[in-house]
Amino acid sequence: YSMMKRIFEDRKEPLYGRLTARISLHPFTTTVIKEILADHAPQFTSEDLLCLYLLTGGVAKYITLLMEAKAFNKTAMINYALSEGSPFLTEGKDMLISEFGKDYANYFSILSLIAEGKTTQREIDSIINKNTGSYLANLEDEYSLIKKVKPMFAKPNSRATRYCLQDNFLRFWFRFIFSNNAVLEMRKNHLLTEYVEKNYEQYSGLLL
C-alpha cells in the first residue's frame, strides 16, 4: 500500500500526478461476513462469526482460505490458521517486510508489543530501549496500521494516548504467531493452538 502511495503521490517519483482514479478496497463489514458464513454453514454460532471476524478482519483473501478449507466453526478456523503450512503463519511477514525495508525488525517489535497490550509510547520505549516516536508516527500516518485512542473516561483535553492495531488479522498475527515463532520453528504447532485456545476468551473479549 505505502509503495503504491509513494509511486503516485511522492513528487520525486516519475508517475507523480498521473493517477486518474483512486479505488480504496475496504474489508467486508460484519454483515457481509455473516452472509458469507451463512452460505457455507447455515447453523453457525455467534462464536463462529466472531472468530471469523477476529482472524480475518473481513479481508476477502483470508475468508476465502478458511471457507475453501471448510473451516466453518471456531475450532476448525483456529486449527487451520495455525496448522503447519497454513498461509496465515507467514502472511504477516510476507506482507510487511518489503513495506518496512531494513527497519522491519523495529517495526515488528513495536507492533508485537502493541498487540500484547503495551499500548503507550512510554511502555514501548522502555522495552525497546529507544525513542520510538518516529516509528509510531510512520505506522499511523504512512502505513495506516495503528491509530491513537483515548483511555475510557479520559478528559477531552487529556494528552494520554494509547495505540492499537487497526487490522484484526495483524493484531492476531502479532499477538499469537509472531510472538511464538520459536514454537513454530520446532514444528510444535499443536502447542500454539493450545495456547491460543487458552487465551482466546480474554483476547476476544478485549476486542468486542
Describe the residue ranges of each PLM region.
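Short, motif-level signal for alpha-helix interfacial/capping segments enriched in acidic residues
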Residues: 8, 37-39, 144-147
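Accessory nucleic acid-recognition modules appended to NTPase machines
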Residues: 62-208
